[in-house]
Amino acid sequence: MLSITPEIIKEIVQGEYHDVFAVLGPHAQKNGYVIRAFFPAAKTLQVKSKLDGSVLAEAVMRNEEGFFEANCNCSEKPSYYFTVGYGDKEFDVEDMYRFGSTIPEGDLYLFGEGTYEQAYRLFGAHPTEVDGVPGCRFTVWAPNAKTVAVVGDFNFWQGRAHVMRKHIPSGIWELFIPYLGEGALYKYEIRNHSGDCLPHKADPYGFAAQKPPEQASVVSVLDRYEWNDAEWFAKANNWTQRDRPISIYEVHLGSWKRVVEEDNRYLSYKELAADLIPYVKSMGFTHIQLMPISEFPFDGSWGYQPVGLYAPTSRFGSPEDFKYFVDCCHQNDLAVLIDWVPGHFPTDSHGLGLFDGTPLYEHADSRQGFHPDWNTYIYNYGRHEVKSFLMANALFWLEQYHIDGLRVDAVASMLYLDYSRKDGEWLPNSYGGRENLEAIDFLRLVNERVYKRFPHAMMVAEESTAWPGVSSPTSCGGLGFGYKWNMGWMNDSLQYISKEPIHRQYHHHDMTFSLHYAFSENFVLPLSHDEVVHGKRSLLGRMPGDAWQQFANLRAYYAFMWTHPGKKLLFMGGEFAQGMEWNHDTSLSWHQLEIDYHSGIQTLVKSLNRLYTDVPALYKEDCMSSGFEWVEADDRHNSIFAFLRKAKDEKPVLVVANFTPVAREGYRVGVNQPGYYRELLNTDSELFGGSNLGNEGGVHSEEIAWHQRPQSVSINIPALAAVVFQLDS
């Protein structure tokens, strides 16, 4: 048996002893059991029987800081509690050091292998019951720490009273604290291998957090919410497949709408459920995509520098409030996607960086572990425990919060070791290449596990390079995502539409080039938040000309986007052509809807969504070359584009767009089939703020061969407008 020396006692009362369970709690000895305890500032301690409350032993103080030792003459381990005296006050308390470990060995193995899909069931703070005693179990990974303690509002943020048990092979620490429950604030006090105390750390697996700028984790119950979306998941496959319409409304919850009268405060999750969801549904979008929801300290990061990956931000309410928001989305037939950030994490002292005094979650070498552009750490994807942490987090959002998919941020920065680095600032892989092999394996693993457990899910990559097979199955050598953002289309088309119409003829290729690769991946066409910040101006602000031309340009551009192959994504404010750049600190400019031009754009987006979801030819073969056919791709002089959208067993749709301020009357377009071509949408309609030049509802084909087709139609194309036709039955 361990000999308890004054030096060991001194280390315990200072919170520096590495193996407190070897000292504190009950220990068998020759004549019964010795029970040791440490209660800072306590004056007396009695060991009492749980059976009848009788005194089993009067403890002797061995250190005036509050270290006690009691001898119980009993043949079996006693069932006991403590009565602790602090002068004129006494308290009955459980001995937290009498409880054994509750961690299954199998869980430790899976975590160490990097394949633990439910790591959050092991780690973090879990209200539970052990041996009939309610309390909270804390578990954290810190293999190189000398000691780890739980600190919080329950112990005046002093760690020496709640030092944890270390599982030496795995580096995992745990402690069950009796009668500590939901709502308690806590962090981890970690001493590095030299015994130096680090800044208090938030729980990497914390399920709730204080509202910033406060930084503590909050004990939270995971599984209490009663969901009401079973009907939604029964039809889940209806909205994730490539042959379904997907129109995504991207939202920053903190600035969609604010309560100006109440100090410009945020809307809560429940208020957003009442206001945002009906609005998005009325606009005809099928999905809501939330910018990062995981807790983050700095508002200006928009959530892309998260500290609490497992905690929905408390800015808008509790975790259960967020579940309510998702639940309401599903009850209104809206899928929910969230931005997920596994590419990097911030350097905040309470975060993951140098977590146990060593580079634990990040690479030790800054050439691999530090991102110079964002001043953030980069995850060490080759470390199994880090893979378990991140993979389990992806699954956590889908399982615990019923999220329908993840948009993975900054994938390119993960794939390339030399991303945004000069020669000499990066390390090649084992083959001498620039590919981050460990990150590639990690992304494939996550996608495989997500789609295996949640076949209905939607995994989307924000990947800005020409990396092949991003949305191809891993079995075919791909990364395994379901979709990829089409950054090339976005950049080229915005570059084109921002030019004066007279110059567009020289940049015609910007609008046609995307069709050379449109079917190489499963694409989403993104007009995201990144395009309306940092001096880029709003989408409306990019349009050339006077006010009328700006709005007409934007209307035509939206119609081109909604009829172009690929799923759709539009950032909030774009649906009514907000005039100013997006500002995360203020509400959208909703007052602009009082202006007809702005309300006309809103009506157009609503009509485009309705058209898109009602006409299968516009979406069923979005990701197949058979779903698109150029009719006129070379009329650069007039800046006119004409194409067909097609699908098996569906009537084709003819789209003609004019990107000059000159109306083209009697413009002839070749068609394959004779008949009446009904005008489904005209962006120049007065409903949308246009001049109302059109085709009186449709046109009849004529037996005049044109564009290598046996038939043709003569149509009026308004200035800076797009018209959409479909062959009538």
From Swiss-Prot:
Annotated family: Belongs to the glycosyl hydrolase 13 family. GlgB subfamily.
GO terms of biological process kind: glycogen biosynthetic process
EC identifiers of the protein: 2.4.1.18
Keywords, alphabetical: Carbohydrate metabolism, Glycogen biosynthesis, Glycogen metabolism, Glycosyltransferase, Transferase
Coiled-coil ranges from the UniProt annotation: none
Record's catalysed reaction(s): Transfers a segment of a (1->4)-alpha-D-glucan chain to a primary hydroxy group in a similar glucan chain
Catalytic-site annotation from UniProt: 409, 462
Organism: Saccharophagus degradans (strain 2-40 / ATCC 43961 / DSM 17024)
Protein name: 1,4-alpha-glucan branching enzyme GlgB
HAMAP family (UniProt xref): GlgB
The UniProt record lists the keyword Glycosyltransferase: yes
CDD domains assigned to the protein according to its UniProt record, in alphabetical order: AmyAc_Glg_BE, E_set_GBE_prok_N
Subunit structure, as described in the record: Monomer.
Gene3D superfamilies: Glycosidases, Golgi alpha-mannosidase II, Immunoglobulins
Pathway(s) per entry: Glycan biosynthesis; glycogen biosynthesis
Keyword Magnesium: no
Biological function: Catalyzes the formation of the alpha-1,6-glucosidic linkages in glycogen by scission of a 1,4-alpha-linked oligosaccharide from growing alpha-1,4-glucan chains and the subsequent attachment of the oligosaccharide to the alpha-1,6 position.
GO cellular component: cytosol
